[in-house]
């Protein structure tokens, strides 16, 4: 079973490349995930729902299914919210540099 990595898109993008397009971020994450042998989901803000709330809900869902879950963010509040359900938290800047 490979890990599922949930990426806080705006947090990661702002960490290193504030002008990077959404598409380029997704492409970089997809290439990284393929190299690392993990599954990745880049999470953006949605209609009426923050990316943070979407990440928290998805993390809880995946954890309940017994999946290995990582979250990439430097957002302190988000890190605290997902900590009980994740196997690894990667800082946004650190994650961006891995891409």
Regions found by a protein language model. Name each.
Residues 2-99:
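Nuclease catalytic cores that cleave nucleic-acid phosphodiester bonds
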């Amino acid at each position: 079973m490979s890990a599922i990595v949930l990426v806080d898109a705006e947090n990661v993008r702002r960490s290193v490349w504030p002008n990077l397009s959404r598409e380029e971020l997704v492409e970089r994450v997809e290439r990284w995930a393929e190299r690392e042998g993990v599954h990745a989901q880049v999470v953006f803000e949605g209609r009426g729902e923050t990316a943070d709330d979407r990440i928290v809900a998805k993390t809880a869902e995946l954890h309940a299914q017994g999946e290995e879950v990582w979250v990439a963010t430097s957002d302190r509040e988000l890190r605290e919210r997902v900590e009980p359900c994740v196997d690894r938290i990667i800082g946004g800047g650190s994650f961006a540099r891995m891409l």
